[in-house]
């Protein structure tokens, strides 16, 4: 990961800019550079992944124009070759192609990128700033306005505290130009339903996911894998193991006493022959990391915080004990193929609408968790299930095909990898367990018990009434909200709401986001 920031005003004060910008130096500890354009300021903290030499340092410049980008552009070599007819390149960095692309295609370039990215571009000819974000929002970007109504962009909300009154997430699939946010790609929108039959669909799911993993293995820095033992991360690791000439490095975390997933992660690691490391966390580590995790996340959402603690601690161990710089993860599968609660979807139309909602909100929940927990430890997250070609195909599939009418959730994904010896059946057909549950049921229980000890019933009721937006409804949610407000006072609207199952569906009217409370959880936690 890298950190970018742009203050789009001639009146921008460098010292104020730097005060905010330095808060995210852990995203890019290798080098830093700030450029004053005359119309504003651009800043870049570098984590070198592609093009490791100093020539790959940003901001890149072309004439009087500059760009900073936190991103990974897949297949950039082809674009670079085409552009090389007119432009000279000085590095092997994928992001160096952005300014030549902008000169050739303008803002149409953003729809041409197979990438996860957030970028801020200064057009020196027009004297204006342009910003953009990938269609899913895998790479973070936030914005706000200063007292003179000048816009400021930054990788994380903490960069903007003190500079703007209101901080908002930059909408994925949009670019900003001349005061407007313009959608260039709504990846959740289906223009034409795909009616491939089951076997054809599963064949394409297989091929597209394999391609999504394979392209994310390319890096000039060392690559590792988060392995929870669940279906999604296990598939990513299994595909990578088949594509790698040497054993891949996998990492799992759990509570020292009852981590469900550690044993399954170990089974996967043994099966695929990975170089596997287990990290154990204690109740004290869980509680002592809580404030730090909420600060780095910039959220008060219950399930995001629960699931982030284990991820934060395992990434911290990877940073401290290895020279790995890139981590592949298993996020985004649930939004495409279904959660435990989507088994209750009344019909295909309802399933599809729920999937679209979840994909459009990913940048506030699972994707946010993966970015922050990994980047704060000076690592880069790559998410194969977020491959644009893969997401577009699965979203376009006939919703009736994706409904759980097979007696097993995520059937299409499981069936797609049933052949080829990717995983043992015990993993491939294992029931889903939420990550925050599976790293140890007791972790969630520790958090709940701690929250219960912080408030009497009377205190809980009175303190909840302080909040009109996304009002806390349990002592745990109140604890998280109060910690959030100490770091981001008055910024609750950065998050659209608490992540919860669709309460309008039969069987889903619950008051906890964990799948454990659903009637169909069954053997998931065993």
Model regions and ranges:
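Cysteine-centered catalytic environments shared across enzyme families
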Residues: 1-299, 321, 325
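ATP-dependent adenylate-handling ligase core
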Residues: 257-315, 321, 338-352, 372, ...
